[in-house]
Every structure is written in C-alpha cells, then in structure tokens.
Curated annotation (Swiss-Prot):
Its cofactor is dipyrromethane. This is Porphobilinogen deaminase. HAMAP family: Porphobil_deam. Tetrapolymerization of the monopyrrole PBG into the hydroxymethylbilane pre-uroporphyrinogen in several discrete steps. PANTHER family: PORPHOBILINOGEN DEAMINASE. GO terms for cellular component: cytoplasm. The modification S-(dipyrrolylmethanemethyl)cysteine is found at C241. NCBIfam families: hemC.
Length: 309
C-alpha cells in the first residue's frame, strides 16, 4: 500500500482544506494511506507588510513547491487564488475539486451592510482587488490593511478600529463559520472575485502517473475549465497581488464559458471590465486580456507596480 505525503500550510483553514481533500480520496476505498506534512511558508511568517509589498503571488506556495520538487511530499492542497499563473517546471495542478462559493464576504462590526456603512468608515482588507472595487463603489471609505489568518482578522475586527472587513466566503464556509459571522455576500457585479477564488488546487509532480490517476477521480471538469480561463487571463496580464486584478468565469446553459475580467487603478477611480463568452478556456482568457489591454490595462498595471515600489 502506497503512503502519500500531503503538504499543507499550518493554518487552521489550510489543514481543514487538506483533511477535507484526503477524506474525499479515502472515500474512494483504494489502497492508499495518507500523511500530512505541515510546511511554513514565507507568507505565513511575514505578517507586518501587505502581500503586494513582499512579492504577492507565490508567497504561500514556494516552500511547498520546493518540498514537491525534492520529493519530501507527493502532493499539496492549495487555495487556487494563492497559485502563481506559471508553475515550476515538473509540477502541475493535478486536480481541481468542485468550486465552492467564490464571492467575497462582508463582515461588519455592528451588522450594517456595505451600503449602510457610515461615511468615512474603516474597511479592513489585504487585497488591492477588493479595495479598488469597493472604493469605486464607496470613495468615502477608508481602507486599512489587515493581515493574518481568518481567526486573527475576525479578532482584529472586534478589538481594533475597523468598522468592517472583507474575507473570502469559501474559507469561512470550509471552517463552518459562514452562518455565524457574514453580514452579507458581495455580489460579483459589485466585487469581481479573485482568479480561482473558492477553488482548490491539488499540485503534484507531472511524472507521478499513479497519483494523477487517483486525483482524476475527484477532478471537477466545470471548475477545471472555468478556472483555466481565469488563469490564462491572469498569466497574459502578468498580474499578481501587486495590482487590482480580478477574473471570474462561469459555465452558461449551453456549456460556454463566460468570463468577467477586471483591472483597476489602486484607488478605484478607474475600473476596466470586460465579459467574454466562448467554448475554449484559453481563447476566452486571452480575449479578455486583449480587450482590457486595448482599454489601457497595461498602463494601469505599470502605475500600480510603481506605487508599490
């Protein structure tokens, strides 16, 4: 019986996601056993700076990918939105389980909705994507950066001067906390989700054919296709955490992919948005990127990167 070593970050959410996925594999009843190896990433250690200032995408995966390449672990369970657009040579996303709710969750201290927040209220987020879109809707709000895992951020909302914070609904759902803490779900027309938000990425070595066959049992083809379109768009624009960028794709009734893609200025004064429909994930992602580039997306990205330096 083969033992599969599964890499995970140490946070409660990461371990919850990892153990959930292992349970899906165990339920297949195949001759494998599993062991979780906890790995500390750079993103877990650097908590006093915004993600965009310390390298953005890849902060939560590099050490785990190193463990995959050196065969310390066999696979890793990541949040898809943490994954860089390009993976190291020899590694691949071997499985995308069914996506859960991709929306952002708005959590306020006193139960006020986003529209009801007082003028000048303080909104906590560590995401340029969220801050740009929400400032576009409410330029009067003050954005204050907030870092840490889910429980840390919820504690900071209670104890510090934040009036509200934004978290991913998916993480709260996986922890079983969504019904207790969420004031409202932000509609994706107000705040387009991050590329891959709500989805998991199971990363493994390309040459591990045995493991890839096992992972195929849990793969969700709809999630795989829609997330692929989002990630192609992200790759074409070379966007990471350093720029307000968003992409969310769904499957239409006739099996076409509908991708809404967005690039914004840091302060939310400019939001470029396009929706593309097609059958090929790569073509849809590239078309969305090309349309936004024609609107001036590259210039916005350059400006955002300069502001971060």
């Amino acid at each position: 019986m083969r033992k599969i070593i599964v890499g995970s970050r140490k946070s409660k959410l990461a371990l919850t996601q990892t153990n959930w996925f292992i349970d899906q594999l165990k339920a297949l009843g195949l001759p494998y056993e599993f062991e979780v190896k906890e790995i500390v990433t750079k993103g877990d250690v650097i908590l006093d700076v915004t993600l965009s200032k310390v390298g953005g995408k890849g902060l939560f995966v590099k050490e785990i990918e190193h463990a995959l390449l050196t065969k310390e672990i066999d696979m890793a369970v990541h949040s898809m939105k943490d994954m860089p657009a390009v993976l190291p040579e020899g590694l691949m996303i071997g499985c995308t389980p069914k996506r859960v709710d991709p929306r952002d969750a708005f959590i306020s201290k006193n139960g006020a909705s986003f529209k009801e927040l007082a003028e000048g209220a303080i909104l906590g987020t560590s995401s340029l994507r969220r801050s740009a879109q929400l400032l576009a809707a409410r330029p009067d709000l003050q954005v204050k950066w907030i870092r840490g895992n889910i429980d840390t951020r919820l504690r900071k909302l209670k104890e510090e001067d934040y009036d509200a914070i934004i978290l991913a609904t998916a993480g709260l759902q996986r922890m079983g906390w969504d019904n207790d803490v969420i004031t409202e779900h932000l509609d994706d027309t107000l705040c387009v989700p991050a590329v891959g938000q709500g989805a998991l990425a199971i990363e493994c070595r390309e040459d591990d054919k045995d493991l890839l066959q096992l992972l195929a049992h849990i793969n969700d083809t709809i999630t795989e296709r829609t997330v692929a379109a989002e990630r192609v768009f992200l790759h074409k624009l070379e966007g990471g955490c350093q720029v307000p960028i968003a992409g969310y794709a769904t499957l239409t009734e006739n099996d076409a992919i509908e991708l809404t893609a967005l690039v914004g200025s840091m302060d939310g004064s400019v939001l470029l948005k396009e929706t593309v429909v097609g059958t090929n994930p790569e073509e849809v992602g590239l078309e969305a990127a090309d349309r936004l580039i024609k609107q001036g997306a590259k210039e916005l990205i350059l400006a955002a990167n300069k502001e971060q330096q």
